[in-house]
Structure formats: structure tokens, C-alpha cells
């Protein structure tokens, strides 16, 4: 396939040397590292034979750092220095972190990404995640017997630019060469598609510890295409734990619990949730700091009932993602379950009822993402055979665009565009003699900038002064395979250029992620009306300004009545532009145009006479 001759990031030109590359699933609850051995993707285990590494980091006062199982053991005895589920904090501010009251950490909200105070000083989520990646990298090098060429690291499909960049920064800090960031649902499709040689449309239902992603993928003749994605970056297995934890507090009449009791009971809730996967009921026993004992039993049905609202939160994205892909549940050939939380029977039951078929579970849902990442890493490292060629096409989940005059959004890269992608549009100046232009890059589906998310701002200076509308400024958007955006602006006649690499200070809030697509659909009618009105208002402003300028320059061409007529039309248009009906504003613009027709003709004649003055007929070039 000719397209595959283009080198991916990190891919070597040496075709016959096997390079050591791994796939890493950097998870909220657990992380894994996998590689391809003898053509088969396998997860790499530690010296104790354990594949899964708990995503937990503990900082000691003496400078030691523990990662994984040993760190998890200290969660109840040293909670402030034992950091769990750090993935939920990546690229986020304190106000974006859910269930803060249930966490024992000493957060510092210093603007930008949240920080945590430990006995080894203030740590960022990037630094904490880097420790997990270091441990996985060391495990891989010990298992494979040499240094790694690079790694493919998976991220939730709904991670925004800040969260993706934070992941790449953590890998760099850990000494890993990132071949590519890969969306977790896409990684699962890679594993299932290659292992089972299946073709068709698949839904990837990924409910991990801290995030929920749903993707619709089309697998056909070696091409993996993501048709649409949706999800919730703040919904996962941790939320099921928290709901059961609240149930325990209510049943045991514990109010309010101490920090130690909260941690102990949250751990018991997690253990009970896991037991209910295979059992009809689970005991919950714990001794509180007051010496009071908690002795409860929760049934599978009770747990299903108390968490039904969480299951329901996954249903709306499922309907939305199918609508985006132009499909119905009956068009889906199979449903791939990803993430440990999908082991819950009532989750599998809800998915089966929605799609009318039993979901696929023949690969370990905890390992499938790492396996797919390993297969992709093997390809990018240049280890694939010719017959193994396939193309992977990810998509961008939210539209990218620019603010135009009047606070309108001009979408440059529409959502669900295949990555990597480059798109460009030309813009022009609004005023005569304009020598600079400010650009505001936004993300979202709404028509007005105020309803979208601001990503970055930059300026292009040095534009040659021209009349309004004469300058040509080409703005190019480039989104790479990792979903990271760069924007450049170039004035075509002079070549002056400015650019920006979009690295937002922190990620989308939970509410923004959950509502941006929903609001785009719900407000489409209002948005289109608002856009039409604002477009006419901007045009009215332009026409009024141009006419006023013309009166200042060439008002002598008019008699008093003619000038008064034009001034009345200007005043009427100003009044109409303050209204809320775009059709009426448009009529006002047309009325002013009619009132100035004769004036425009005289100005043109006057300009021609001025240009010809002092020249002979034979001197004029046609």
C-alpha cells in the first residue's frame, strides 16, 4: 500500500533490524506494558509474574520512590504521599477534579495544572506519571534484554491537547521516545482486528478506572478508520466505587467519616465491586477509627440499582456516536469491551440490550489496549512484514476554528476529521490600512465564539497597508497523529508569518467535555439565527464605516439633500442593526446601498478624471 511508505514518527529506515518497541497502557487504576514476540502481542510481567502495575506512586521522606504494589500497600498508612489515579489530574486544574473531598491529597492550585504537596516537595501529575512510565520502561528493558527504540502510549479518545501534551511530557521525563499517542479504543480495535481478522463496523465500549470512551470504527481491507468518538473524561470505575462507598456510609450511619475511615471504606467498596463480578453478593467488613465495626452485605442487584445512573450516563454518548457515524445499533457487527469496569455484569447486560447482541470479551479487557498499542509500536518501529501492512486512521473529536469579526466561529477543521490533517483558509482585513491581525483559535461546535472553548491567541504583524479586503492572509491548521495542533498565518504578498503551537494551560472541565457536543445539537437553531444576525450586523458596521469614510473624503460631490438622504439611511441602518432580526438588518443594508448608488458612481467618475488629468490619449495604457 503506497500510503504506508510515508514514515511515521520514530520509524527507522533500516528495514531488517528488529527494534525493541513497546505499547504502554497508562491507565487510571492499572498500567501495562506489552510487546510483540514472534508475531504475537504479549503483556510483559514483573519478577513476580504480574502484568498489571497499579498506577500508584509513593514518595518517602528519605528520597525513595515506590511504584505499584508496594506503594499500594501504604495507601491507608501514608495517604498524602501515596498518589492514586493520577491520570484524572493530567492537564487539569483543581476546579476540574471530581470528588476532591474523598481524596487525602494536599492539592495546590497555582494556576494551570494542579499540583500535589508530598514529603519530597510539590509534584505535578506529569512527574508522578513519569515514575509509572519509568517503572514500565525498566520492566520492558529487563524483559527484552536491551534499550527501547520507543513506545506507543495510549490515551482516552477524549483527552484534549493539554492532557495529551502532559502525557508526552511525562514520557519524555521518563526517558521514553514516544512513537505515537494512540487513542485507547483504537488500540483495542487494532488488537481485535488483527487477532481475529474481522472486517466491518465495530463499537468500542471503553469503561476504565477514570474515563469512558465510545468509538465507532470501520475495519476494512487493512484500513482501521475511526468514524466517530464520544465519551466522558470524568466517568469510570472509580465512580462506581464512590457510589458504593456512599451506600456504605448511609447503611452504617457514618456521618461524617474521618479521612482514615473514608480511605478504608473506599478500598472495601472497590473490593466488594470486584467480588460482585463473579458472586451474587459480597461482604463489607471494616473496623473504623472509633473501634466501631462495619458489617454489611451488598448484593449484585443492589449494586446494579445504586449505579444505574452511571450506566445511564454511558447511554447518551452511545446514541450520539451512532448518530454522528450515520448508523443504527443494527449496523454494528460487534461490540468490543475494554477496561476492567466492563467486567461488571450489569454493564455487559446494558450494552447487550442496547446493541441487541452479546459484547465481545474473548480478549482480556484489562490487557487489550496494551496489546493493540504493542502491535502499533511494532509497526512504527519498522518490524512489520510486507503482508502485515495496514493503515490506522484516528479522528479529531471536536471542531477547530477561528474567531471572525463579530465573535463568530469559522470552523477550519470539522470534528471527526481523520488525523493527521492539514487544512487552510484565506482571510482578509476589515479596515483600510490594517497592518496587524489578531487570531483566536477555538474548539467546539457552537456558532458563537463565546460558546466555544478558547485554545490560543496570536498576532500577525507587518501586513502591508492596503484597502480593506485587499490583503490575503492564509491560515493553516495542522493536527498531528497525536491530536496536537499548530496554527500558522501568512500574508501572501509580503510573506510575513506567525504561528502558535497549541498547548493549553489545562484541560477541559468535566462539564465542558460532557456538554459541548450536546449543546451543539440542542442549540443549533438558536445558534444559526445568532450567527445570521451577527453576520448582518458585521456587514452593517462595515458598510456604515465605508460610507462615513466616503462622505468625509468626497462629500463635496453631493448637494445638501443628497447628503441628508444618505445620513438618514445610515441612521436607520444603525437602528435596525441593534435589533434581533437578520432579515430586517439585511434590508437596511440594501436600502443604504440604494441611497449611495449615485454617490458611488460620481466617486468612480471623479477617480477616473483624477487619474487621467494631465495625460494625453496616446499615453494611456490599456
From Swiss-Prot:
Keywords: ATP-binding, Chaperone, Nucleotide-binding. GO terms for molecular function: ATP binding; ATP hydrolysis activity; ATP-dependent protein folding chaperone; unfolded protein binding. InterPro entries: ATPase_NBD, Heat_shock_70_CS, HscA_NBD, HSP70_C_sf, HSP70_peptide-bd_sf, Hsp_70_fam, ISC_FeS_clus_asmbl_HscA. It comes from the Bacteria. One of its GO terms (biological process) is iron-sulfur cluster assembly. Belongs to the heat shock protein 70 family. Chaperone involved in the maturation of iron-sulfur cluster-containing proteins. Has a low intrinsic ATPase activity which is markedly stimulated by HscB. PANTHER family: HEAT SHOCK PROTEIN 70KDA. This is Chaperone protein HscA homolog. It comes from Aromatoleum aromaticum (strain DSM 19018 / LMG 30748 / EbN1) (Azoarcus sp. (strain EbN1)). The gene is hscA.
Amino acid at each position: 500500500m503506497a500510503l504506508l511508505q510515508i514514515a511515521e514518527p520514530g520509524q527507522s529506515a533500516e528495514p531488517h533490524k528488529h527494534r525493541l518497541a513497546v505499547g504502554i497502557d497508562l491507565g487510571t487504576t492499572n498500567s501495562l506494558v506489552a510487546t510483540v514476540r514472534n508475531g504475537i502481542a504479549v503483556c510483559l510481567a514483573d519478577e513476580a509474574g504480574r502484568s498489571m502495575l497499579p498506577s500508584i506512586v509513593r514518595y518517602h521522606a528519605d528520597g525513595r520512590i515506590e511504584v505499584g504494589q508496594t506503594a499500594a500497600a501504604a495507601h491507608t498508612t501514608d495517604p498524602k504521599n501515596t498518589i492514586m489515579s493520577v491520570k484524572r489530574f493530567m492537564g487539569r486544574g483543581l476546579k476540574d477534579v471530581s470528588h476532591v473531598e474523598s481524596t487525602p491529597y494536599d492539592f495546590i492550585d497555582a494556576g494551570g495544572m494542579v499540583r500535589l504537596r508530598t514529603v519530597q516537595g510539590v509534584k505535578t501529575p506529569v512527574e508522578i506519571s513519569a515514575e509509572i512510565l519509568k517503572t514500565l520502561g525498566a520492566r520492558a528493558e529487563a524483559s527484552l534484554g536491551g534499550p527501547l527504540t520507543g513506545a506507543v502510549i495510549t490515551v482516552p479518545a477524549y483527552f484534549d491537547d493539554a492532557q495529551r501534551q502532559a502525557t508526552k511530557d511525562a514520557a519524555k521525563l521518563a526517558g521514553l521516545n514516544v512513537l505515537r499517542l494512540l487513542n485507547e479504543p483504537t488500540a483495542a480495535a487494532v488488537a481485535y482486528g488483527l487477532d481475529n481478522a474481522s472486517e466491518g463496523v465495530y463499537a468500542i465500549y471503553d469503561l476504565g478506572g477514570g474515563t469512558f470512551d465510545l468509538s465507532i470504527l470501520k475495519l476494512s481491507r487493512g484500513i482501521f478508520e475511526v468514524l466517530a468518538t464520544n465519551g466522558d473524561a470524568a466517568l469510570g470505575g472509580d465512580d462506581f466505587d464512590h457510589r458504593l462507598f456512599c451506600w456504605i456510609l448511609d447503611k452504617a450511619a457514618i456521618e461524617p467519616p474521618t479521612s482514615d475511615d473514608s480511605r478504608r471504606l473506599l478500598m472495601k467498596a472497590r473490593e466488594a465491586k470486584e467480588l460482585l463480578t463473579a458472586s451474587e453478593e459480597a461482604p463489607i467488613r471494616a473496623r473504623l477509627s472509633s473501634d466501631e465495626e462495619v458489617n454489611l452485605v451488598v448484593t449484585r442487584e443492589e449494586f446494579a440499582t445504586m449505579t444505574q445512573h452511571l450506566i445511564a450516563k454511558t447511554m447518551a454518548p452511545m446514541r450520539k456516536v451512532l448518530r454522528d457515524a450515520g448508523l443504527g445499533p443494527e449496523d454494528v457487527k460487534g461490540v468490543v469491551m475494554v477496561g476492567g469496569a466492563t467486567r461488571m455484569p450489569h454493564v455487559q447486560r446494558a450494552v447487550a440490550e442496547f446493541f441487541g447482541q452479546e459484547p465481545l470479551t474473548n480478549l482480556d479487557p484489562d490487557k487489550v489496549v496494551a496489546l493493540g498499542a504493542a502491535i502499533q509500536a511494532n509497526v512504527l518501529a519498522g518490524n512489520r512484514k510486507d503482508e502485515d501492512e495496514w493503515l490506522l486512521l484516528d479522528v479529531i473529536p471536536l471542531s477547530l476554528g477561528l474567531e471572525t469579526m463579530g465573535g463568530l466561529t469559522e470552523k477550519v477543521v470539522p470534528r471527526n476529521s481523520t488525523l493527521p490533517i492539514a487544512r487552510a483558509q484565506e482571510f482578509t482585513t476589515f479596515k483600510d490600512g490594517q497592518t496587524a491581525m489578531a487570531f483566536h483559535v477555538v474548539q467546539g461546535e457552537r456558532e458563537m465564539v463565546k460558546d466555544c472553548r478558547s485554545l490560543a491567541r496570536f498576532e500577525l504583524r507587518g501586513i502591508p497597508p492596503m484597502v480593506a479586503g485587499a490583503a490575503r492572509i492564509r491560515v493553516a491548521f495542522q493536527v498531528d497523529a497525536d491530536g496536537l495542533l499548530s496554527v500558522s498565518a501568512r500574508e501572501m504578498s509580503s510573506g510575513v508569518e506567525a504561528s502558535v503551537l497549541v498547548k493549553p494551560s489545562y484541560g477541559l472541565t468535566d462539564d465542558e467535555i460532557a456538554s459541548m457536543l450536546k449543546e451543539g445539537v440542542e442549540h443549533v437553531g438558536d445558534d444559526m439565527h445568532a450567527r445570521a444576525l451577527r453576520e448582518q450586523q458585521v456587514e452593517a458596521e462595515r458598510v456604515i464605516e465605508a460610507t462615513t469614510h466616503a462622505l468625509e473624503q468626497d462629500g463635496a460631490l453631493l448637494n445638501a439633500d443628497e447628503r441628508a438622504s444618505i445620513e438618514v439611511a445610515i441612521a436607520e441602518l444603525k437602528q435596525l442593526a441593534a435589533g434581533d432580526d437578520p432579515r430586517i438588518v439585511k434590508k437596511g443594508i440594501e436600502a443604504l446601498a440604494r441611497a449611495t448608488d449615485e454617490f458611488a458612481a460620481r466617486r468612480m467618475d471623479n477617480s477616473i478624471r483624477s487619474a487621467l488629468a494631465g495625460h494625453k490619449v496616446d499615453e494611456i495604457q490599456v
